[in-house]
Amino acid sequence: MLHKTPFPHGYQQWMFAVSEFILRPVLWSFSEIVSIFLPTTAEQSSIMRHYSLNLPLLPLYLIVLVCLLVPALIAFFVRCILHLFRHSYILSVRLANEHHYKAPHKKQCSISTMNICLMPEFLSRFNNLSRTSQRATAVGQRIIADQIQSQNRSQAPSIVGNIETNFPEMDFICIQEAWHRDYSKTLVDELHTVYPWIIYDVGNSSLFNNYFIFNSGLMFVSKYEILHASFKTYSHSCKQCLFSGKGLLMVKV
């Protein structure tokens, strides 16, 4: 059975959305506070400008964090309970034409994999990356632009020793490190321009699996119909992986 909604019942989905709405400003303010003191390499080249632009906002972030902390703790507790009933993935389908995306009789297909580091801003900065929301949009737009160009241009012969700077035409994309739910939805909206079938928000959350923190970070993007999907959580993890529900996503197309 394919899950197109995160929960089996509508009221559970509504309660989860409300708890996420309450949590979002607290998590955002905390991330912004920590991010001030984690400048990227580009920001370190003009460190005084970085601090002069961001330090004046610190009192605002602290006010939001302190004022909403208690409601956020309650919302987090509610969200943890709801996670026990949540499906292990969401299938998003957006068809432009019912007949256009039938699986073709092809002898081969193209599959790409990519790690995109969609995490909260302060965690992305440990990888020397910033502006995660804008980066999620940019990644999706770049993939789609290259797919459209690949479809429109004639097949050129390969050049020995050539390094491609564009994404090739891809039937399927296996994405990793898409941990942030909001940024993942932004990426999904962009990719739906070409890819009608997308599985995202993959993972099971529990106290002993990931401490209700991050999902698996997996996403599967397909031009052709997804017939079945299943996710199995790894039984053991260590170090920072303890906070993400990593596992194996199995998809049939």
Regions found by a protein language model. Name each.
Residues 176, 192, 212-229, 251-253:
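Conserved beta strand-loop-helix elements of the APE1-like EEP
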Residues 117, 203-204, 224, 232-235:
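Short, solvent-exposed coil/turn elements at secondary-structure transition points
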Residues 229-253:
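Active-site catalytic loop in hydrolytic enzyme cores
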Residues 107, 214-217, 244-249:
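Residues that flank catalytic or metal-binding motifs in active/ligand-binding sites
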